[in-house]
Amino acid sequence: MVKRNINLNKCASRQRGVALITVLLVFALVAVIATELLHRSQLNLRSVANLVDTRQAYYYALAGEAYARQLLARDVIDGKGEIDNLLEPWAKASEQPPFEIADGEIHIEIHDLQGRFNLNSVIDENGLASPTGFPQFKALLVALQLNNNYANEWLDWIDRDQQRTATGAEDADYAGYRTAGAPEADISALRLLRSMLPQDYAKLAPHIAVLPENNAAINVNTADAAVLRLLSPIISDARATELVARQKSGGFRTIEEFQQAAGLTQSAAVPIGLNSNYFEVLITVKYANHWQRVRTILRRDRGTQDGPVSFAVLNRVRSPLIDDLE
């Protein structure tokens, strides 16, 4: 009888021990689940906060773009739009202090795309190699000490046929995607060329643009020396440097004045002008520890004497993170 009671007590003790362990395991499991839920909740909150901040930074960038439009519109309204030069407020936007906003700032740059070489001018209206634009692109590459085979690859990228040009490349040479076979909308398409190197793209980018008009005039008041040399073989490096120096003091008031300064006795190889309709707007926003860059290509339509100045967005690209901010 005594042994039986002892055995019963031992069984009861073991059962209480098992129950205690079970309770502890349940509490541990609940604690793990609660911790995981709390961690996920914190991640979700951070994710939502980052999304909200990124979206707000983008809206600030659009506000900066709207301000850039006002500068470009005011240039026309004030009667200065007939001549666009580097002394005008839109051209000096990057020299102004950033706009201060709550927990951040907005930096604005405006660049005249008609002061750059138009990559789409490499082909003519029939989608074939242009007798002027194609060799000019080669000349630009040589002037920048870059591989002039890029010109062949670019021509094959945007021309309408599938015939390789010298060292060029057509659809069969690009695994996973095809050539455009038409004028491009953004210079970043150059990155897709078969042999394009990142450092070469970075060196070439400040001198080029892609415009919807193959024959858009080059603005001699904003073009850099490398582009000015493309206008005529008689424009030497030294002469191009002198022309750029003139730009810094207001540039040229007439085409004849430029031709005389450049030593041109006949028309330039491409159309030239004194004003511009195509601009690149770069907006960099710092907001709540977030960086946002928006690059917009604008076409400015001057309107009529009674009509307002209007703008068309040809392209807009944004990047939440940037690595080239100075």
Regions found by a protein language model. Give the residues of each.
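Compositionally biased linear targeting/interaction segments
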Residues: 2-8, 18-326
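Short coil/loop residues immediately preceding or within conserved phosphate-binding loops
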Residues: 15
